[in-house]
Amino acid sequence: CRDAGFRGLRLYPKWHRYALDDPNGLALVDAATELGMVLSIPMRVEDVRNRSWLIDVPEGPTSEIAAVVAARPKARFHLLNGAGFINGPLGRKDALPPNYLIDVSRMDSVLTNEIGLLIKSLGADRLVFGSGMPFNYPDLALLKLEVLDAPEADKQKIAWENAAGWLKLG
């Protein structure tokens, strides 16, 4: 996959019914880390309000993700489609190694201002833009960034600079 230009690996632990912190999950994290890949982990794949009652897949628990982030400081994680980070160790700058970025696709910049709160507690350099495309229209995500009460330099970090650096694009 490296020869084909891949820069990351998307993991779906809850959908594929494995735990990231069990020996096989950690072996997968270690193998991807050895290849220099970013590990992309969606906290939520599908909104429970829209899916069939026959599908019972919980959201990725932040406690399990935080444990793996702490256990594998050389790995690089991209946590996407999540919310509520501000209340746990993933939302505090000195709680875990700086080996993860959080995508802002499910957060808001006005009502609870989770994006603004994370800028203050974690730093703009740990957040990346996310839109949920192709399943969501990007307009709302772009608007959230536009109305965010933050310096323009922080908005640029979130919009593209952090992701470009994380993926080693330039």
Could you tell me what each predicted segment is?
Residues 1, 9, 32, 102, ...:
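Conserved, mostly hydrophobic/aromatic
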Residues 1, 92-94, 117, 143-149:
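Short, aromatic/basic amphipathic alpha-helical patches
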Residues 7-8, 21-128:
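Catalytic pocket-lining loop regions of alpha/beta-barrel enzymes
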Residues 12-19:
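The substrate-binding groove and active-site-proximal loops of carbohydrate-active enzymes
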Residues 15, 46-47, 159:
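Conserved beta-strand edge residues that scaffold enzyme active sites
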Residues 17, 108-110, 135-136:
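Short gly/pro/ser/thr-enriched loop/turn and capping motifs at secondary-structure boundaries
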Residues 123-126, 139-170:
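Mid-to-C-terminal alpha-helical segments outside catalytic/metal-binding sites
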Residues 130-139:
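Short glycine/proline-rich, acidic loop/turn segments that cap or connect secondary-structure elements
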